[in-house]
């Protein structure tokens, strides 16, 4: 059954969310497109993530509104009526995604190996990727084309950006002055750093390096409050764009920034897509698993200390997916460490 002896006619990718994981799908998709240029690709994706990913050419998108609950499953069934695929790549271990996988007609349904097929994912597939342990999420995703017979790995994240998004970014970053983009919030509050610490780094970036500093983020009340707190605490001018951009506009802005400062969040992986180095703040999560794929050396990594302090174990002793989302965990990251890492990063740039 696998690997395929020849290029399949059609492949369906099932990965709904989140934005960072969707970013990891892109090089996997680009690799398959290059190796199998005649293959038809369909991606079942959540509504929010589709706002960026649907810009990828040559892919059919089936968009899922997760707020619709079981109604979303029925909607996918209707959209897929008459579709048959040579393979389904079931790349999400949530039960919601597995219910959607049931609606896909495919000869081969590839899931994770048994050890990683949480939430009974193995019941919804008839093939699996090779068993591996303690690897980055992106590397685990490359196990799927490998199972189909593709040995190549193309680290290509290119997404064509609309002219309007590029103009938005150019208006904010119109010249060669280096820009520090701060995206201060993650999807989980315990991954977030204190506003006054972001402000201290912003002050250093402006005074020591002459940087422009822009805050970015979504429209949630927490993000808006965090942005306002950073602006109040900083004794230098900042541009607060939190809640004011779309995903394509954010990607265009990241492309014009010199550095992104952020905790474990979607923008970390968006920055990787456009080649912008990421100064990642990691205490609650392990950057070796979920950090910026091309900026591991620029992460301030307090995960080991967090494991010892809050779990009383060495990080190597914890299950690979362990998150230490405990109050105070991000306080382990000191301002001085982040400033030192920023200085080192900027010295390394041409």
Task: Set out the residue ranges of the language-model regions.
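Catalytic machinery of carbohydrate-active enzymes
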Residues: 1-350
């Amino acid at each position: 059954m696998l690997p395929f002896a020849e290029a399949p006619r059609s492949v369906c990718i099932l990965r709904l969310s989140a934005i960072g994981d969707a970013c990891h799908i892109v090089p996997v998709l680009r690799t398959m497109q290059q190796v199998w240029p005649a293959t038809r690709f369909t991606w079942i994706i959540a509504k929010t993530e589709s706002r960026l990913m649907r810009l990828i050419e040559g892919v059919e998108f089936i968009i899922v509104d997760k707020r619709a609950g079981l109604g979303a499953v029925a909607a996918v069934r209707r959209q897929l009526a008459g579709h048959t695929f040579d393979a389904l790549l079931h790349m999400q271990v949530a039960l919601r995604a597995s219910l959607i996988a049931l609606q896909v007609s495919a000869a081969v349904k590839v899931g994770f190996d048994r050890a990683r097929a949480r939430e009974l994912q193995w019941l919804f597939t008839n093939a699996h990727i090779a068993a591996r342990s303690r690897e980055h999420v992106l590397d685990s995703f490359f196990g799927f084309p490998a199972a189909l017979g593709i040995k190549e790995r193309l680290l290509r994240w290119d997404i064509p950006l609309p002219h309007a998004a590029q103009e938005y970014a150019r208006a904010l970053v119109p010249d060669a002055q280096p820009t520090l983009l701060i995206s201060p919030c993650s999807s989980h509050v315990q991954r977030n750093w204190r506003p006054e610490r972001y402000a201290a780094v912003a002050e250093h970036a402006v005074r020591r390096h002459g940087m422009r500093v822009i805050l970015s983020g979504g429209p949630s009340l927490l993000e808006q409050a965090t942005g306002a707190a950073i602006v109040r605490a900083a004794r230098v001018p900042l541009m607060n764009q939190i809640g004011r951009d779309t995903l394509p506009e954010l990607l265009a802005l990241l492309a014009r920034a010199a550095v992104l400062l952020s905790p474990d969040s979607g923008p970390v992986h968006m920055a990787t897509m456009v080649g912008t180095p990421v100064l990642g703040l990691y205490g609650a999560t392990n950057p070796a698993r979920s950090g910026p794929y091309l900026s591991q050396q620029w992460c301030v990594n307090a995960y080991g200390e967090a494991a010892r302090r809050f779990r009383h174990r060495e990080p190597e002793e914890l299950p690979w997916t362990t998150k230490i989302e405990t109050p105070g965990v991000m306080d382990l990251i000191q301002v001085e460490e982040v400033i030192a890492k920023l200085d080192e990063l900027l010295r390394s740039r041409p």
